[in-house]
Amino acid sequence: LDYSDTEEYYEEVANKIDEFIEEYKYQKERILGVSIATQGIISPDGSGVMYGTIMNNVKMRLSDFSSKLPYPCRLVHDSKAAAYLELWNHSELDSAVVFLLNRNLGGAIITNRKVHEGSFMHSGVIEHICINSDGPLCYCGNRGCLETYCSANALEQAAGIPAKEFFPLLREKKSPQIIQIWKDYLNHLAFAMKNLNLVIDAPIILSGYLAPYFTEEDIKYLAEHLHTAAPFILDKTQILVGTNGQYTPAIGAALHYVEKFIQSI
């Protein structure tokens, strides 16, 4: 369902939620709430999107959904939602840097087992770190953002094929071009990991759509590349890989109400 700022769109979303509830025969009175994970920076009060260039959803408001659903509702930035899931999956972590390797790149900072929001809600927006001022044009209007090198879209554009076709070819190790494209991707990723680790001395979590495609060999390559480029060693055990793929933000968003319920018991 493609986003559009129309009553028809919000009605359709509400209808699909109702259909889902009916299909799986959930008891409505036991539904804790509905979390909507979306691309775009959410306002501090959670009432709407205040920056949404990718989806052009800056007019999206929480009330667009809550007025059509009989449940508590909340909006959450997809990258922050992904971080909630990684926190849930890694109870041993106090702090971390999350790379959300989705169609568009995202990120989040975890400190003291909380997702850091920042004064204006854009803490952890690592996709707009500039790694080459003469690089490709980013959707934000600047050049050389990490988005243009390490998003799934950037990888697919470089390869000219979808990720689901790229990785089987890569693992065959028969195409020097495919191997080089992946090596370039990992080099840019390692560059960003190195710099962020100097700011946040904590494990790095590779999460989202591309994460399940990473192998032990890839993690070893990243760790070795980091060792040669940084004054401090980031052991490969400090590079964690998420397992929930493209559904990471959706699951993480839902956990808000699950955790709230557990704490109320």
Spans of model-derived segments:
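Glycine-rich phosphate-binding loop and adjoining helix at the ATP-binding site
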Residues: 2-22, 30-95, 216-228
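Glycine/GP-enriched mid-protein hinge/lid loop-to-helix segment characteristic of carbohydrate kinases
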Residues: 2-9, 63, 68-176
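Adenine-nucleotide phosphate-binding core of ATP-dependent small-molecule kinases
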Residues: 5-27, 148-149, 154-216, 241-242, ...
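Short, active-site-adjacent cap segments at secondary-structure transitions
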Residues: 40-44, 81-83, 106-107, 116, ...
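General small-molecule cofactor/ligand-binding pocket signal
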Residues: 74-76, 238-242
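Charged, glycine-enriched surface loops/patches
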Residues: 226-239
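Nucleotide/phosphate-binding catalytic cleft detector across ATP-hydrolyzing
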Residues: 263-265
